[in-house]
């Protein structure tokens, strides 16, 4: 009986909070403030214009990734970020129900199909699930299903049963024999989907093995994560613990922590295994209570960067975290309000301070992301995956508010 009353109390609290949020949004619209959706519509229309200009100049890429100076940077389908822009358009279709976005999503997804047999990368989930995965979810086009199943089959060819993980990179062979990065956890969602669609347990077993091995070897006692773990492919033993995009091997690269939070939340959703939920909560606790976390909850690019507060932020880490927290709020009744309110606070900060001015930023929605500071690459710029998880967070927030 007490548990029933507790659940009712939580539901009432969330409902009250949601009603307040909806009333505030209506008030802002009446005052003439541009809604997040209207802002996104205008920005993407502008992005299409900028994309056409760059293509007309001879650029060969298929998808916008970022900006360099005053230039829109396009990438080939093999780039790990190639699926995010079409994913953004699928989310726009879902948010608006306007078939204009459906057609644009199809258009920008199409060139990525060839990646379904590209076995030299672990990024199949990012490229295929974010594009065709959303496309199949929203249209049930059987062609999209076939593309995804083939992609999942390609991805598991990189699995080493001795290590228990999917290999991340083939490059940097001089540093690692078998590197696995925390980002790789995000690609498991494609495998869980493939298992449900085909009933082939191989997909499930590979995903669970990778998640378990990563949980064992990637995380420190405080539940912060290393970026790269090097394995001996013959013995499965850990040989190195490093970073590639963070400040140092022992630092906490902000986006890496966000990948961990998001992916273990997803693993709990797909398996029902409580150890993944516990892992997600502990990672979330580390992120949200870190002394270097700014008040607006948009982290610096690394929680241990030496010149905080004079360090670049990483908006992409914030958007991934917000999206993950919205989902996590549906899984932990006793912390539902806390997680949702925290995600709401992140989104409020993004909308207030980190949203691009209309018809600027080459059409990207958000500013101030950091891709790879040690390599002096993509520092304090818009990056397409920040927009992707921002839109996903908007969708998840909308569903919770209903």
Give the predicted meaning of each segment:
Residues 1-31:
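Bacterial Sec-dependent N-terminal signal peptides
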Residues 22-402:
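Glycan-recognition and catalytic cores of secretory/periplasmic carbohydrate-active enzymes
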């Amino acid at each position: 009986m007490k548990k029933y009353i507790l659940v009712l109390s939580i539901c009432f609290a969330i409902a009250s909070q949601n009603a307040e949020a909806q009333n505030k949004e209506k008030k802002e619209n009446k005052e003439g403030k541009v809604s997040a959706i209207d802002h996104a519509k205008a920005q993407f229309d502008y992005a299409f214009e900028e994309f056409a200009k760059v293509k007309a100049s001879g650029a060969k890429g298929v998808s916008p990734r970022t900006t360099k100076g005053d230039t829109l940077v396009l990438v080939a389908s093999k780039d790990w970020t190639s699926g995010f822009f079409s994913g953004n358009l699928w989310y726009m279709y879902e948010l608006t129900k306007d078939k204009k976005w459906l057609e644009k999503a199809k258009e920008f997804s199409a060139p990525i199909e060839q990646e379904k047999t590209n076995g030299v990368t672990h990024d199949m989930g990012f490229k295929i699930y974010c594009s065709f995965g959303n496309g199949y979810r929203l249209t049930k086009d059987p062609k999209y299903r076939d593309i995804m199943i083939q992609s999942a089959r390609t991805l598991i060819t990189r699995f080493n049963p001795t290590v228990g993980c999917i290999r991340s990179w083939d490059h940097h062979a001089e540093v690692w024999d078998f590197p696995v990065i925390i980002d790789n956890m995000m690609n498991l969602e494609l495998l869980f989907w493939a298992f449900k669609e085909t009933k082939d347990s191989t997909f499930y077993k590979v995903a669970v093995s990778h998640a378990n091995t990563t949980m064992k070897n990637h995380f420190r006692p405080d539940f912060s994560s290393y970026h790269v773990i090097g394995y001996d492919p013959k013995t499965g033993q850990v040989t190195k613990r490093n970073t590639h995009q963070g400040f140092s091997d022992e630092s906490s690269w902000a986006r890496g922590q966000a990948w961990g939070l998001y992916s273990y939340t997803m693993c709990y959703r797909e398996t029902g295994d409580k150890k993944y939920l516990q892992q997600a909560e502990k990672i979330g606790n580390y992120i949200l209570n870190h002394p270097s976390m700014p008040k607006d909850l948009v982290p610096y690019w690394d929680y241990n960067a030496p010149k905080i507060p004079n360090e670049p932020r990483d908006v992409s880490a914030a958007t991934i975290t917000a999206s993950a927290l919205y989902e996590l709020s549906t899984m932990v009744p006793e912390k539902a309000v806390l997680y949702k309110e925290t995600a709401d606070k992140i989104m409020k900060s993004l909308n207030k301070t980190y949203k691009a001015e209309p018809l600027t930023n080459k059409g990207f929605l958000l500013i101030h992301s950091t891709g790879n500071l040690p390599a002096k690459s993509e520092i304090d710029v818009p990056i397409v995956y920040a927009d992707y998880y921002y839109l996903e967070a908007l969708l998840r927030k909308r569903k919770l508010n209903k």
